Amino acid sequence: MAKERRRAVLELLQRPGNARCADCGAPDPDWASYTLGVFICLSCSGIHRNIPQVSKVKSVRLDAWEEAQVEFMASHGNDAARARFESKVPSFYYRPTPSDCQLLREQWIRAKYERQEFIYPEKQEPYSAGYREGFLWKRGRDNGQFLSRKFVLTEREGALKYFNRNDAKEPKAVMKIEHLNATFQPAKIGHPHGLQVTYLKDNSTRNIFIYHEDGKEIVDWFNALRAARFHYLQVAFPGAGDADLVPKLSRNYLKEGYMEKTGPKQTEGFRKRWFTMDDRRLMYFKDPLDAFARGEVFIGSKESGYTVLHGFPPSTQGHHWPHGITIVTPDRKFLFACETESDQREWVAAFQKAVDRPMLPQEYAVEAHFKHKP
């Protein structure tokens, strides 16, 4: 009997919607919540275990199943749960993928099943109201210390602002929603709730690093920023549908890591730098947590004269790392050295993705304004 029940549960995985994790979309889920009636992956099952008042989990393959539990799974399933628990997810709300950090997945799961934010829209006020203020820990630009700072997000002004003192009349910085991006970077920032916010200042990218001790708070900030971007883009591109706008709300970096670089004459020694590939901007920093990039390189499309090559030009000297990459732009060549072959492969793939993609009209404007820094 036990074997038959387990086989019955396994057969339910073949039903439409059940072949991927109900929460992050990972293929071939091996776990199930027998109180919610959903099939989930191993990673998400760990989060479900932390909300036992809502969800109780079992291994599809290894645990014993009772008849009533099998029947419950059969009468529910991922599609039914989605129809109930995700019926009112705002278009701008970030839905995590298998590669996202633990925090995003945990808050998505808690929002769905524990707080039921997508059944009762009034619970979405913290990120849907168009205005948000509160205190966040912000990393100091020069000393690297995290200090509590007041942040204000106002859609009416199209800006995120922060203040150095509680009683300050003027903000220390005003970040325009138009050019703002936010991406979770727990490992780099050294905090599980670490968020990196970038914006353009004088056409150069400025980084700020923030976190909040409460996971819900920082994810609410993240989704409030996405909501502000969504509403800004709806006005800027009135003909565009949600499907066109949602991918533009926030970007994860295509690739980050250390490479060596040399200057424009290619006679100087190579220096180790931290590189971030953000859409078509390749930025390099002395330290991963620097506020400003030392330089930025725009990577356009092959139609505009950009090429990526494996290796160095002949007679290149001064690099400590053996695996070379050459980026050819209409102005000059940029040389980079990677420590490992797999690093080189990943960087070339990231660059190639940008080069193979035709440029949008607004990207030509960015290219024209771009400062090619040595």
From Swiss-Prot:
Query: Phosphothreonine modification sites?
Result: 276
Tell me the PANTHER family matching this sequence. Answer: ARF-GAP WITH DUAL PH DOMAIN-CONTAINING PROTEIN 1, ARF-GAP WITH DUAL PH DOMAIN-CONTAINING PROTEIN 1-LIKE PROTEIN
An example of a Pfam family matching this protein is: PH
The UniProt entry's GO biological process terms, in alphabetical order, are:
cell surface receptor signaling pathway; regulation of GTPase activity
Record-listed Phosphoserine modification sites: 87
Quaternary structure, from the entry = Interacts with PRKCA, PRKCI and PRKCZ. Interacts with the N-terminal region of PRKD1.
Q: What is its main location?
A: nucleus
Q: Where are zinc fingers of the kind C4-type found along the chain?
A: 21-44
Residues the record lists as N6-acetyllysine modifications? 272
Instruction: Indicate yes or no for the key word Zinc.
Output: yes
Query: Boundaries of each Arf-GAP domain copy?
Result: 7-126
Gene name of the record: ADAP1
| Modifications made to the protein after synthesis | Phosphorylated by PRKCA, PRKCI, PRKCZ and PRKD1 in vitro.
Which Gene3D superfamilies does the record associate with it?
A: Arf GTPase activating protein, Pleckstrin-homology domain (PH domain)/Phosphotyrosine-binding domain (PTB)
Annotated effect of mutating residue 21 to A: Loss of GTPase-activating activity
InterPro entries per UniProt: Arf-GAP_dual-PH_domain (IPR052589), ARFGAP/RecO (IPR037278), ArfGAP_dom (IPR001164), ArfGAP_dom_sf (IPR038508), PH-like_dom_sf (IPR011993), PH1_ADAP (IPR037849), PH2_ADAP (IPR037851), PH_domain (IPR001849)
Domain PH, residue spans: 129-230, 252-356
Record's subcellular location: Nucleus; Cytoplasm
Put simply, this protein is called: Arf-GAP with dual PH domain-containing protein 1
Q: Which GO terms describe its molecular function?
A: GTPase activator activity; inositol 1,3,4,5 tetrakisphosphate binding; phosphatidylinositol bisphosphate binding; phosphatidylinositol-3,4,5-trisphosphate binding; zinc ion binding
Q: Which GO terms describe its cellular component?
A: cytoplasm; cytosol; intracellular membrane-bounded organelle; nucleus; plasma membrane
